[in-house]
């Protein structure tokens, strides 16, 4: 009887430790020291859309339109990759990237809102997706480790980035050589929660990014613009970056 009681206590301790470990692993945190501060970059002379929701539309509609499948195919995502879901929100991309990159890969789900990441943590635990790490960022700085990403995806969030030049500048060191930055957005004015492609190209070029390809996505999913980040050694000085006038 005593042995059975002791075994039960030991099992409870193991469960408590495992639960604590999972909670700590899911706790949103900055994954890198601060990069260059927002004040050294030119303020964008254009609107910045408010962050109004962690979701764009229902996930069923996005799946029916084939959004994720099209993006994954174009980017040639595969097992073993480390992919950043920047502005992860409710985790539409994160939960689909997780099985795609597999146990040998990693998804870093980053957002500036701790509350969104807390909700995503609960979703990940329910779905038992162990290869997703949560990362807290700032509006001008994603705060991600150097050379950690094979690809980074910003899905329907670029128009909400308050300091695009600082954000892109501080993101570049996190991308491995040859890594892709994929931006998905609607071809609409910023105020209507989209980014005109010409404006997007101008802002990324101002920080040294090179456009690789441009694709119109199925249904109303918008467009996918793929860029290659500049080498850190060739990044322009923040004081020389010129704002793209709208």
Predicted regions span which residues?
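Class I SAM-dependent transferase core
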Residues: 26-84
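A short acidic, Gly/Pro-enriched loop at the edge of an enzyme's catalytic core
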Residues: 140-152
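A short glycine-rich, Lys/Arg-flanked "PGG" loop and its adjoining helix->strand segment in the class I
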Residues: 98-99, 165-180
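Class I SAM-dependent methyltransferase SAM/SAH-binding core
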Residues: 84, 88-142
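Core SAM-dependent methyltransferase catalytic element
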Residues: 216-246
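A short SAM/SAH-binding and catalytic strip from SAM-dependent methyltransferases
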Residues: 150-164
């Amino acid at each position: 009887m005593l042995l059975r009681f002791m075994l039960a206590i030991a099992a409870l301790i193991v469960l408590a430790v495992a639960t604590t470990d999972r909670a700590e692993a899911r706790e949103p945190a900055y994954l890198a020291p601060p990069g260059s501060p927002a004040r050294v970059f030119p303020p964008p002379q254009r609107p910045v859309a408010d962050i109004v929701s962690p979701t764009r539309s229902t996930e069923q509609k996005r799946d029916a339109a084939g959004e994720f499948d099209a993006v994954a195919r174009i980017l040639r995502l595969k097992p073993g990759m480390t992919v950043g879901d920047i502005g992860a929100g409710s985790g539409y991309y994160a939960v689909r990237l997780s099985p795609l990159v597999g146990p040998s890969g990693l998804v870093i789900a980053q957002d500036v809102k701790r509350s969104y990441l807390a909700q995503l943590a609960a979703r990940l635990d329910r779905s038992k997706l162990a290869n997703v790490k949560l990362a807290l960022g700032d509006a001008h700085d994603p705060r991600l480790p150097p050379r950690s990403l094979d690809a980074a995806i910003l899905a329907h969030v670029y128009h909400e980035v308050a300091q695009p030049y600082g954000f892109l500048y501080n993101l570049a060191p996190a991308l491995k050589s040859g890594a892709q930055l994929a931006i998905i957005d609607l071809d609409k004015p910023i105020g209507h929660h989209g980014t005109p492609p010409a404006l997007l190209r101008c802002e990324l070029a101002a920080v040294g990014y090179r456009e690789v390809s441009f694709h119109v996505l199925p249904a109303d999913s918008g467009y996918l613009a793929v860029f290659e980040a500049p080498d850190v050694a060739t990044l322009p000085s923040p004081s020389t970056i010129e704002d793209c006038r709208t």
